[in-house]
A protein has these predicted regions:
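Hydrophobic/aromatic-rich structural module bridging two neighboring secondary-structure elements via a short loop
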Residues: 51-91
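Conserved small/polar residues in nucleotide/adenosyl-binding loops
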Residues: 172-174
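Surface-exposed beta-loop interaction hotspot
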Residues: 79-161
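N-terminal ordered "arm"
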Residues: 2-65
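Ser/Thr- (and often Asn-) enriched beta-sheet segments in non-cytosolic proteins
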Residues: 163-165
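Acidic-enriched, low-complexity/disordered segments with a strong bias for Aspartate over Glutamate
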Residues: 7, 12-15, 34, 46-50, ...
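A sequence-level detector of short, solvent-exposed, charge-rich linear segments
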Residues: 42-46, 70, 123
Length: 174
């Protein structure tokens, strides 16, 4: 349910049943990388919300929580959500402030229609993610790492007649 905030401004809300700690970790990391990060909320089912967050790497990261959002597709400040999640123990309704839909960079990935091409061992993904983080630290200046390094394919998976190339920027753990 959307509610009127100070001076009659309509604000967005997110009611979380479970999954708050994982969401808190993701959003806190995203804000640490980009204080102006945005969050977009998609009501996947009656009680499941996909929460997407922007990153400075042109990759959108996400977490799924049990909950209900005031408006499907609402975009809010990641910093505001992070602050609300710090104050909230595990479940409850969060006041996310005013919508900022215009700040979202593009379309979300489709909610359905995916198929598993292959499964990667978590140790491989973790090792690549750690190397990606080391790479970003090496280029900690305002320009960051060269996009050619971030866009470089680090894993190629094949299966069911499909080939998928995964670039480094998709594996950087935020």
């Amino acid at each position: 349910m959307r509610k009127a905030g100070p001076e009659g401004m309509v604000t967005e809300t997110l009611e979380i049943g479970s999954g708050g700690p994982g969401l808190r970790a993701l959003v806190t990391r995203a804000v640490g990388l980009d204080s102006g990060a945005s969050v977009r909320l998609r009501q996947l089912t009656d009680d499941v919300v996909d929460v997407f967050v922007t990153t400075p790497f042109e990759v959108v990261a996400s977490r799924r929580v049990q909950g209900v959002v005031s408006r499907d597709g609402a975009v809010v400040s990641a910093a505001t959500l992070a602050e609300q999640l710090k104050e909230q123990e595990s479940s409850g309704t969060l006041d996310l402030g005013p919508a900022r839909d215009a700040s979202w960079p593009g379309a979300l990935p489709p909610a359905t229609g995916y198929s598993v091409v292959d499964t990667l061992p978590v140790t491989v993904v973790r090792e690549l993610s750690d190397k990606g983080q080391q790479l970003t630290r090496q280029f900690s200046g305002p320009m960051g790492p060269p996009s050619s390094l971030l866009n470089q394919t680090v894993v190629t998976v094949e299966g069911e007649g499909a080939t998928v190339e995964i670039p480094m920027l998709s594996l950087i753990h935020i």
